Every structure is written in C-alpha cells, then in structure tokens.
Swiss-Prot record:
<comment type="subunit">
    <text>Forms an active dehydrodolichyl diphosphate synthase complex with SPAC4D7.04c.</text>
</comment>
<dbReference type="GO" id="GO:0005783">
    <property type="term" value="C:endoplasmic reticulum"/>
</dbReference>
<keyword id="KW-0812">Transmembrane</keyword>
<comment type="function">
    <text>With SPAC4D7.04c, forms the dehydrodolichyl diphosphate synthase (DDS) complex, an essential component of the dolichol monophosphate (Dol-P) biosynthetic machinery. Adds multiple copies of isopentenyl pyrophosphate (IPP) to farnesyl pyrophosphate (FPP) to produce dehydrodolichyl diphosphate (Dedol-PP), a precursor of dolichol which is utilized as a sugar carrier in protein glycosylation in the endoplasmic reticulum (ER).</text>
</comment>
<dbReference type="GO" id="GO:0019408">
    <property type="term" value="P:dolichol biosynthetic process"/>
</dbReference>
<keyword id="KW-0256">Endoplasmic reticulum</keyword>
<dbReference type="InterPro" id="IPR036424">
    <property type="entry name" value="UPP_synth-like_sf"/>
</dbReference>
<keyword id="KW-1133">Transmembrane helix</keyword>
<comment type="similarity">
    <text>Belongs to the UPP synthase family.</text>
</comment>
<keyword id="KW-0472">Membrane</keyword>
<feature type="transmembrane region" description="Helical">
    <location>
        <begin position="5"/>
        <end position="21"/>
    </location>
</feature>
<dbReference type="GO" id="GO:0045547">
    <property type="term" value="F:ditrans,polycis-polyprenyl diphosphate synthase [(2E,6E)-farnesyl diphosphate specific] activity"/>
</dbReference>
<dbReference type="InterPro" id="IPR038887">
    <property type="entry name" value="Nus1/NgBR"/>
</dbReference>
<comment type="pathway">
    <text>Protein modification; protein glycosylation.</text>
</comment>
<protein>
    <recommendedName>
        <fullName>Dehydrodolichyl diphosphate synthase complex subunit nus1</fullName>
        <ecNumber>2.5.1.87</ecNumber>
    </recommendedName>
</protein>
<keyword id="KW-0460">Magnesium</keyword>
<dbReference type="GO" id="GO:0006486">
    <property type="term" value="P:protein glycosylation"/>
</dbReference>
Amino acid sequence: MYDDIFFYLALWVIQSVYGAWDWAKNWVFWTCSYLLNFLYHHHCSRDLIRRDTKKLKKKPKHIAVIIECVEDGGIEGLIHDACELSAWCVCSNIRELTIYERKGFLKQSPEAVEKAIYSHLPFYLGGDKCTVHVTNPCSPDEKNQNDCVDLKVHLIAKEDGRDAIIDLTRGLADLCTKKVISSTQVTLELIDKELKESVIPEPDLLIIFAPLLKLQGFPPWQLRLCEIFHDPILYTTNYLTFFKALVHYSNAEMRLGH
C-alpha cells in the first residue's frame, strides 16, 4: 500500500516538475519570439527589408508558402496575406512565389488577388513601379503568359497535389493503351517535365504558416529538393517567420544525396 502511495506521489512530482519546466520554456520562447517580431518589424519599408536580406549568403529564387483560411479573416484575410507575402518577396528581390491554400479560395479569383497586390505594393514601394502577374497554373489561359515580370505568383490548392499525379498517370496509361506512345517513352524526365508544366516549377523554400507542421496535400513532386521551414510559435503570416525562413535557407547545405 505504501509502495503504491510513494509511486503515485513520485509520478505526480515528476509530472509537476515537467509541466512547470515546459510552461517556463514555452513562456521564454513566446517572449523572445514576440520581442524579435517587434525588433524585426518591416514597418512597410523596402529599405528595412533589403537591409535584413542583404547580408544573407544566398536567397531562394522561388518561395512557396502554405497559408490557412481562419474564421476571423476569411477570404479578405487570405488576400491580405497574399499581398504581404508578395510585397516581402519584391523587397527581397525574390521573383517567384507560390501560395498554397488547401481549399482553393484564392485560386478561384487570380484577377482579384492581382488587383489587391497592385493596390498594396505602394505602401512598400512608394511611387516605384513593379509588375506582378498572378496565375492559376491549371488554367489553359496561363500557358503563354509573359514571364518578364518583377514577381510571378502561382495560386494552387489541394487538387493540384496528388490528384495532378493521378490524372497524369491515367493520361499516360490511356495514351499507351491507344498506342499513341509506347511504355518505354514514359520516363522520369517526361513525368518531371509534365508535372512542372501542369502545376508549378519546383520551389527552393517552403514556409508553412500554420499551427502544425503538415503539408496539407501540397504537391509532393515539387518537394524533392525543397527546404521546409515552420515556426510552431509565430505560425500566422508574419515577416519575422518569413525572414527566419530565409536565414534557414541561407545556412542550409545542399548536399543533393552526397
């Protein structure tokens, strides 16, 4: 009987100590994160953002982000996040941005997103001109668009992930059945080319703005050589997490299997 009491008492003490330590650790992390968020706030200044990113050893040419539609923000919140991310990319001289929103709310209105971005950029750029093109990669109207822009924004959703691979597999199988192509012509290079053309080019860096580290159905083919960054504390769309992701990419070693 006394052994049982001692066991439960020891277990309670261990759990209490661990709980207190975990709470203290999280409090320190939260405090430091919000302090850094204040110190590294961009203040809608292109010069401040360029000062931050200028010292990086290397920067990604193509960034992908995962954002979520929250009840408080709705569609307007998603569009605002897209505008902020686009402005940060322009100020950081990053020319390609992919925005993944699982349910596809943004993807349904690329023209509205592009118009909102153009309205938002003057807060950062002042009177300087900047060309932005927002695309829905699955739309047939996007195939021949001019790439000579300051920023190209791709809007994708869950249907562009595994479903795109399944559709491509079915299409190639159908072509083989109809003798249009032979099975020997179905190579890794062909699949890679088709997926990049039908969805998006492979990003260099993926930033997950969500509470949990989940890919949420993001196109898996595009993540083979991609660096992934997630901040479990500051997980909403914010500049500090964006900048920390750039620092993470700058310090990463690309061994490519060696």
